[in-house]
């Protein structure tokens, strides 16, 4: 964006009274630009208000600033991402539970070895543990 040079309309000089059409044109452009900026800021403030409603505030009584809102949103998104990635590691909770049981058996000196995945799956189905989702 190139720098704006002050015009005669800005200076309030005698030329304003000599060329009212230029002055009115500049005023209309300035009013239109101000209206666009006001509308942009209202949209931005509305977006921040909506973000504040979905981001946990953890006991804050005062309204969060824009900066604080962005920081809280970032922390919240990262926490949700961690939860999802941790949940992704435990796709099959029955097998995870079974692996924990086998680990316990191995530490006690009982080692079970299966030659095929079918035998392992049969063993898995014989356990009565059922995962209950939240």
Curated annotation (Swiss-Prot):
Changing residue 44 to P: In th241; no retinal ganglion cells. GO terms for biological process: axon development; camera-type eye development; cell fate commitment; eye development; neural retina development; neuron fate commitment; pigmentation; positive regulation of neurogenesis. CDD domains: bHLH_TS_ATOH7 (cd19714). SMART domains: HLH. Keywords: Cell projection, Developmental protein, Differentiation, DNA-binding, Neurogenesis, Nucleus, Transcription, Transcription regulation. GO terms for molecular function: DNA-binding transcription factor activity, RNA polymerase II-specific; E-box binding; protein dimerization activity; transcription cis-regulatory region binding. Residues 15-27 have a biased composition (Basic and acidic residues). It is found in: Nucleus; Perikaryon; Cell projection, Axon. Transcription factor that binds to DNA at the consensus sequence 5'-CAG[GC]TG-3'. Involved in the differentiation of retinal ganglion cells, photoreceptor population and optic nerve development. Required for retinal circadian rhythm photoentrainment. The keyword rRNA-binding does not apply. It comes from the Eukaryota. The keyword Nucleotidyltransferase does not apply. GO terms for cellular component: axon; nucleus; perikaryon. Residues 28-80 form the bHLH domain. It comes from Danio rerio (Zebrafish). Residues 1-27 are annotated as: Disordered. PROSITE patterns: BHLH. This is Transcription factor atoh7. InterPro entries: ATOH7_bHLH (IPR032663), bHLH_dom (IPR011598), bHLH_transcription_factors (IPR050359), HLH_DNA-bd_sf (IPR036638). PANTHER family: BASIC HELIX-LOOP-HELIX PROTEIN NEUROGENIN-RELATED, TRANSCRIPTION FACTOR ATOH7.
